[in-house]
Amino acid sequence: MKTLLLTLVVVTIVCLDLGYTIVCHTTATSPISAVTCPPGENLCYRKMWCDVFCSSRGKVVELGCAATCPSKKPYEEVTCCSTDKCNPHPKQRPG
């Protein structure tokens, strides 16, 4: 019984030591895809802002992984989250 308990403790420690990786949507690839974030980057983010084509194409959207939530500039909307695929693209931007 002690051997079984010790084995379970060791397995638990090994599994916890592997760490958790999060899956985020990213615009670094075309088309937009979901990727497993590198170790240490445990947040998904979505940045949106208007460029010169905003009135015809809509906002520019940047999606990705981050270790810390990116700093927000005055003209940007930034959201961060910490569950798999929690940063979807609000809509596909034309062309």
Swiss-Prot record:
PROSITE patterns: SNAKE_TOXIN (PS00272)
Main location: secreted
Signal peptide range in chain numbering: 1-21
Places the protein is found: Secreted
GO cellular component: extracellular region
Domain of life: Eukaryota
GO molecular function: acetylcholine receptor inhibitor activity; ion channel regulator activity; toxin activity
Keyword RNA-binding: no
Tissue and organ expression note: Expressed by the venom gland.
A family per Pfam: Toxin_cobra-type
Disulphides: 24-44, 37-65, 50-54, 69-80, 81-86
Alphabetically ordered keywords of this record: Acetylcholine receptor inhibiting toxin, Disulfide bond, Ion channel impairing toxin, Neurotoxin, Postsynaptic neurotoxin, Secreted, Signal, Toxin
Function of the protein: Binds with high affinity to muscular (alpha-1/CHRNA1) and neuronal (alpha-7/CHRNA7) nicotinic acetylcholine receptor (nAChR) and inhibits acetylcholine from binding to the receptor, thereby impairing neuromuscular and neuronal transmission.
Record note on quaternary structure: Monomer in solution, homodimer in crystal state.
Family per record: Belongs to the three-finger toxin family. Long-chain subfamily. Type II alpha-neurotoxin sub-subfamily.
Protein name (database record): Alpha-bungarotoxin isoform V31
Organism of provenance: Bungarus multicinctus
Classification lineage: Eukaryota, Metazoa, Chordata, Craniata, Vertebrata
